[in-house]
Amino acid sequence: KFVLSKIKSNYKYFNEDYDYLFNSYYVKAGPRYTRSLRNIISRPGIEEILEYRKTINQRIIELSQSSNSNLDMIEVGCHHEMQHQELMLTDLQHGLSFNPTSPKYDPTKKDIENENIKQEWISFEKAIKNVGTNDEYFSFDCERPSHEVLILPFKISNKLVTNGEWIEFINNKGYNKSEYWLSDGFSTCQQENWQSPLYWKKENSKWFHFTLNGSKEIDLNAPVSNISYFEADAFARWSNKRLPTEFEWEVASNNHIHGNFLENKIYQPYSKKNGA
């Protein structure tokens, strides 16, 4: 809507009340409905919302195909929409997790069988590297400008930390040993009584994880998920390792990355295949 109303001089509102209802925090877009009361808004209903979405999608497609389209603004809008999709899945998992019947978000989704990946360490030599970008293609402001940074020698694992490895951390009382934690992290850990990743539950000596595909017995080979930065940092210290820096990760991620996209309808991270 922001893109369309800026570019199209004859833009017609689907519903003028939507600006007020759906403005989460954009001050320049006008007044906003009280944040603490937004959860009680039950109208417009799902059919009207889907029709609104369909209308906006069609207008964006038409605009992108026109000769006077502003592709930069459209691309920013598309990236922002992808953030919304990620947040909606996160909220859906959190909301459904309170249902005692452990419902599935998508009953048609199949589970992925994760392989036990052999861990290898990929080495990077000391170097001065360019990070960020000055290119004309899309980028966020925080990714600019391109500049040089000194990268000291480091190694990074070829695979993600698995649930099985995380259970070892739990069994070693990792959540109760302050020496592994940053100060704020350990305070939060104690205050909120963290003893495992979010959505994990132990029943009859077995660990279960609530996912968008319902509650499942933990797949020991699957990458761990639903953890905080504090937990990740504590695990790294317990492992006598550390997390990569922002610049180390930017350099390392220039290698081929095995991706998992929303279209796959696999709403959990999964391990790459051996040899991939």
Where are these regions (language model features)?
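Short alpha-helical functional segments enriched in proximate histidine and acidic residues
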Residues: 2-6, 63, 87-91, 169, ...
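Short capping motifs at secondary-structure boundaries
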Residues: 4-7, 154, 161, 169-177, ...
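Short, helix-capping/interhelical loops that line the mouth of catalytic, cofactor-
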Residues: 5-57, 97-113, 211
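Short glycine/proline-rich turn/loop motifs
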Residues: 33-43, 66-67, 144-150, 205-222
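Cytochrome P450 catalytic-domain "roof"
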Residues: 60-69
